[in-house]
């Protein structure tokens, strides 16, 4: 079974081909250094997992990545995508939801981000994010690429049997993530 962890960063998953675009990791199971906005050297893929990767591509590069993913997957293969939920972020910002904003600031930004706007913009720009994804946009693009059974899930809720292994408890990720699964 060919399982890919695309845009893995430091999240190396045993049993997966872990693909990132940074220095290799000595402790990796299998680690490839590939610019996924340009290359997609895989075929006959059973599982694609990408956690907080798609937002690091421009809109057009993200669409191309989704198309290439679809073409590389076997019929019946599954893809799970986690991205910051732009709609959720906009709502929390407009509602001045300090509990949400402070939880993110404490997990990822630090005390230099005291205001609602600084936290919101810190999420958008401080981590190399190039695109914001909401459910409607991601669902539309996945459908356009040919994916089926597109559904919104929760963190740690998946058709993947090993989801507790893939997504260990992480309050920051759980707080802000739009989780989507789809099939070829």
What is the role of each PLM region?
Residues 1-2, 11-14, 114, 160-163:
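Short amphipathic alpha-helical surface micro-motifs
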Residues 3-91, 180-184:
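Conserved SAM-binding loop
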Residues 59-64, 68-74, 78-183:
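S-adenosyl-L-methionine-dependent methyltransferase catalytic module, highlighting the catalytic core
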């Amino acid at each position: 079974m060919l399982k890919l962890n695309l845009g893995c960063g430091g999240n190396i998953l045993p049993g997966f081909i872990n693909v990132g675009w940074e220095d290799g990791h000595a402790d990796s199971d299998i680690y490839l250094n590939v610019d996924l906005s340009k290359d997609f050297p895989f075929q006959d893929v059973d599982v694609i997992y990408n956690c907080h990767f798609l937002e690091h591509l421009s809109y057009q590069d993200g669409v191309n990545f989704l198309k290439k993913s679809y073409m590389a997957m076997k019929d019946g293969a599954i893809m799970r995508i986690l991205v910051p939920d732009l709609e959720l972020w906009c709502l929390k910002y407009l509602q001045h939801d300090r509990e949400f904003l402070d939880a993110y600031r404490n997990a990822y930004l630090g005390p230099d981000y005291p205001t609602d706007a600084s936290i919101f913009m810190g999420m958008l720009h401080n981590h190399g994010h190039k695109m914001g994804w909401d459910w409607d946009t991601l669902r539309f693009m996945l459908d356009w690429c040919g994916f089926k059974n597109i559904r919104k899930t929760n963190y740690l809720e998946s058709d993947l049997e090993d989801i507790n292994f893939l997504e260990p408890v992480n309050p920051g990720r759980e707080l802000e993530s739009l989780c989507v699964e789809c099939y070829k």
